Every structure is written in structure tokens, then in C-alpha cells.
């Protein structure tokens, strides 16, 4: 195993890392949606995350765009991702200076389904497609304690958005 495949060598991503990566994805014309912890943070949650979760269009052309975009990272670990990996594996972990988890589906939801109601969020100088709160709830349907906390936050956010005072 190559050292760059070991996520213990990566550091926790910071907001500036996310912005830089999303800017590069946008410049490459990659089709992606931010999910996971950073999506919750983009919606106002206060939480820690140790990786960047991206739901991507798993077509070979788009995988090539994502790999090109992620080549800005120090170790270019994304170069090891094969065109079919996203379709063949639940999660493809790119352990570079930060860890990025690439998925073609999240809890049964495809990129196309999630992108349909994604919200565009301005994060720094990058316009980022972020999974909607309703979609994020569907991706948090697990038994992990953090997912229960995230679901409660998202349900409250949806209620606040539907409130007349919102």
C-alpha cells in the first residue's frame, strides 16, 4: 500500500480547502454535489468533519474532470482513481493532503436525483452545489449517532424555512 492511500497521513479539511477544491471542480466543468458534513456546515450547522464528501456524476468523462480538478492537491492521489471505480464501489476514498470521498450514489440516491434540488451556495469565491436539507436527511438514514444529530438539525432547518417568519 502506498502511503498516500492511508488517510492517517491526511489532515482534517478546512473551509479554505473545500473552497479551493470546489473552485477547481467548477473550473474543470465537473458535475458534483456537496454532501456530508460540509453540506451541513453550508446550511448553518456547527460541526466538525474529517473529510469532504462529493456525490458525482459517475460517467467516465466526468470522472476524468473530477480527477483533473483534484490534481491540485499535493499528492495527486486522485490519479489512481479508475474511470469505473465510482460505479463499482460505494465510496472511493482519495486520501491526499485532505480526504475526499467520491460517490456515485449516496443511500441509494444518484447524482442526477440529488442535483435536481441542490442549492447553489456561495462559499468564498466558489459557487457550490450543496444537497438540499430534504435530500441530506435521506443520506443520513443510518444508525450513526452523528447522523441522528444531523437529521435533527436538518428537520429543524426545514421547519424554520417553512415558518412564516422565515
Regions from the language model: what does each represent?
Residues 1-166:
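Compositionally biased terminal segments of proteins
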